[in-house]
């Protein structure tokens, strides 16, 4: 009997027979993942190149591109529920790479009560989403995008800026005022505690952008224009002299303690690169699993992994992008070695199986689910065995 081969589910699909051959999708794609068929002129998607930024989806005038993450139906459904949950008519749309904590949002836009909507890239937000929000009672929309030069998807931030500018002109003509949609930009940067710096140079060695430099008398200075906020230098600093806005060491420690207390055993904590795993807008948390989403797998600190085990977590899974998919100059690939080194040390005391590192991509939505299911099964077996 021949083995049945099942096709891998993909996150983005193009209905080629309905394509109008307008060429907009492959003009905006930052990764050359969409090609023009030489004979028909229709769009063809090369899924292995696709990074699921959503730019093609938001730009297609014929609506022949489908995306399973944060599409029009899921976003508008979320807004309908969120208006009641947050009791607000102000919407704040944030790129995951630019968004500070909620207090930071308040400082940016001067709002204290709002509906938060965090997406991998604001470039995927279509005109229809803005119009649907306005026509269903949203009075004010704020958009927080990455600085144009720091967009993880290269073109998402500048494209959305132009889209919002054009839409504001239309909305003004329809009587919604001169700036119905407010756009601001933000990039999260590393922070230096000079009194703790020991001048070891680790940050200088590891940074993909040459942002840190040592100055006399051995104190690190950061070129903030060069810093892309991957967090690799923070994870590699032995003196805890560096921190990253919104992903500070103490904040992550607080989340670890909170999640360990919330979960039922066997407890699994997942450190995710937020570009490798896209969460659903309103996932009901599994009682055994919690997630800490990071700006890059490079921000995974082995001290946090040890801390998780110390607080009662039974298994830790690190989910990263493959090096070729990394949005931060392959910084995430440098996270694997320290995690595997810790795994080896844990193996010496019989705990190596309780830590795992995997690479996944949102283009294949089921891939992470499989990794988590396999790891969860292993941790459950260990828990049962040790509880016997």
Model-derived features with residue positions:
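Ferredoxin-type iron-sulfur electron-transfer modules and their immediate structural context
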Residues: 1-35, 87-131, 135-216, 266-297, ...
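Iron-sulfur cluster-binding cysteine motifs and their immediate structural context
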Residues: 20, 24-46, 51, 55-73, ...
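Primarily the internal scaffold of c-type cytochrome electron-transfer domains
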Residues: 69, 73-85, 92, 246, ...
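Long C-terminal interaction/binding lobes of large macromolecular proteins
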Residues: 313-314
């Amino acid at each position: 009997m021949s083995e049945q081969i099942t096709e891998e589910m993909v996150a983005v699909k193009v209905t080629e027979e309905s394509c109008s051959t307008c060429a907009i999708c492959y003009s905006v794609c930052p990764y050359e993942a969409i090609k023009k068929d030489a004979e028909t002129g229709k769009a063809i998607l090369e899924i292995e190149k696709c990074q699921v930024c959503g730019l093609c989806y938001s730009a297609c005038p014929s609506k022949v591109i489908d995306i399973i993450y944060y599409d029009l139906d899921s976003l508008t459904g979320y807004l309908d529920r969120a208006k009641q949950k947050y009791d607000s008519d102000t919407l704040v749309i944030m790129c995951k790479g630019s968004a500070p904590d909620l207090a930071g949002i308040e400082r940016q836009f001067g709002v204290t009560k709002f509906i938060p909507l965090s997406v991998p890239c604001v470039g995927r937000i279509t005109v229809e989403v803005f119009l649907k929000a306005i026509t269903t009672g949203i009075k004010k929309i704020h958009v927080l995008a990455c600085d144009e030069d720091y967009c993880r998807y290269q073109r998402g931030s500048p494209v959305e800026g132009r889209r919002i500018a054009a839409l504001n002109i239309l909305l003004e003509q329809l009587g919604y005022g001169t700036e119905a949609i407010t756009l601001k930009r933000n990039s999260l940067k590393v922070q230096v505690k000079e009194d703790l710096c020991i001048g070891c140079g680790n940050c200088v060695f590891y940074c993909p952008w040459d942002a840190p430099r040592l100055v006399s008398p051995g104190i690190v200075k950061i070129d903030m224009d060069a810093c892309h906020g991957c967090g690799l230098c923070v994870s590699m600093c032995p003196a805890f002299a560096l921190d990253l806005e919104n992903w500070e060491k103490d904040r992550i420690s607080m989340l670890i303690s909170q999640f360990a207390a919330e979960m039922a055993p066997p407890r699994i904590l997942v450190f995710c690169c937020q570009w490798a795993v896209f969460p659903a807008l309103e996932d009901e948390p599994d009682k055994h699993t919690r997630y800490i989403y990071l700006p890059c797998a490079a921000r995974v600190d082995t001290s946090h992994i040890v801390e998780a085990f110390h607080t009662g977590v039974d298994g830790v899974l690190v989910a990263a992008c493959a090096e070729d998919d990394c949005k931060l100059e392959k910084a995430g690939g440098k996270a694997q070695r320290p995690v595997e080194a810790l795994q080896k040390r844990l193996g010496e005391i019989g705990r190596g199986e309780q830590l795992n590192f995997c690479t996944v991509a949102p283009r294949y939505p089921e891939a992470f689910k499989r990794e988590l299911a396999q790891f969860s099964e292993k941790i459950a077996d260990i828990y049962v065995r040790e509880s016997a």
